[in-house]
A protein has these predicted regions:
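Short, surface-exposed ligand-recognition loops at beta-strand->loop->(often short) alpha-helix junctions
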Residues: 9-22
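Intrinsically disordered, low-complexity segments enriched in polar/charged residues with Gly/Pro
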Residues: 14-17, 27-29, 39-41
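Residue-level signal for secondary-structure boundary sites
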Residues: 14-16, 60-62, 96
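Glutamate identity and glutamate-enriched acidic tracts
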Residues: 17, 33, 46-49, 66, ...
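An amphipathic, aromatic/His-enriched active-site/gating alpha helix that lines ligand/cofactor pockets
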Residues: 24-25, 30-37, 55-89
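Glycine-rich beta-strand-turn "strand-cap" elements at beta-sheet edges
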Residues: 2, 7-11, 37-47, 73-97
Length: 97
């Protein structure tokens, strides 16, 4: 499996809105993409930080997701709560237990 990891700095007082946007817009948009397995979001409201993990079956599924333009559409919806542009990285995911 593979994961796209997106690190975000959230504006002060906007974490609840951030989580709602992820839950109500981002995750539903990902469900229709090939190879989508799930989404995990970690939040630290005190620090205004959030890390999102989008899990895919394969590297090819991640490439197809990037090419679809969905990421850019979702970031546009999230712009009102972001303090700065997100940082994206890709990893191979190994589940040990």
């Amino acid at each position: 499996m593979h994961a796209r990891v997106v690190t975000n700095q959230i504006q002060p007082g906007k974490m609840d809105e951030w989580v709602a946007l992820i839950r109500d817009s981002v995750v539903p948009s990902l469900r229709d993409e090939a190879g989508f397995k799930g989404f995990v979001v970690l939040t630290n409201a005190e620090a205004g930080e959030s890390i999102g993990y989008s899990i895919r079956d394969s590297a090819d599924d991640m490439v197809a997701s990037e090419a679809s333009g969905n990421y850019q559409q979702q970031i546009a919806k999230l712009g009102s709560v972001l303090a700065m542009p997100p940082v994206r990285e890709a990893y191979e995911l190994t589940v040990l237990d």
